[in-house]
Amino acid sequence: MSIRTGDSVQGFSLPARPGEMVDLAECIGTEKVVLLFFPLSFSPVCTDEFCAIRDDWSAYADLGAKVFGISIDSPFVTAKFAEELGLPFPLLSDMNRDVCRMFDVLHEDLFGMRDVAKRSVFVIDEGGSV
C-alpha cells in the first residue's frame, strides 16, 4: 500500500553516509519535512535538479522545513554526490528500497534498470501527514 495525500507517515531511518544514520522519526510529526526522491546520483538530470535546489535554497529555507533527498544509491555514492554539489541538506540511501516501496516511487523499468526511484516530492506537515 502506498502513501497518499492526507496519510500519516511514520518515522524511518536511512544512512546519509557510511555509519551515519538519519532518524526521520525525530522530525516527522514535529516539523515540516520535504522528501525529494531521485533516480540516480551523478546523472545529468539529477545533478541539474539538485544544483537548482541548492541555488534557490532560500525558497526552501523560508518554508522552515527539513529537506532530505532519497535515492537507491549506496551511502558512499549519495554522500559523495552531496559533497561535490555542496548541498545544504543530506542525501539518504534507500538501497533496500523499503522507503521507496512505502511511498510507491519505484520505476519498474528505467532505461533497463529495475526498481530505481521515481523523481517525486512529498511534503509532510508538522502533524506527520502528507
List each model region and its residues.
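Chalcogenol-based redox active-site neighborhoods
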Residues: 1-130
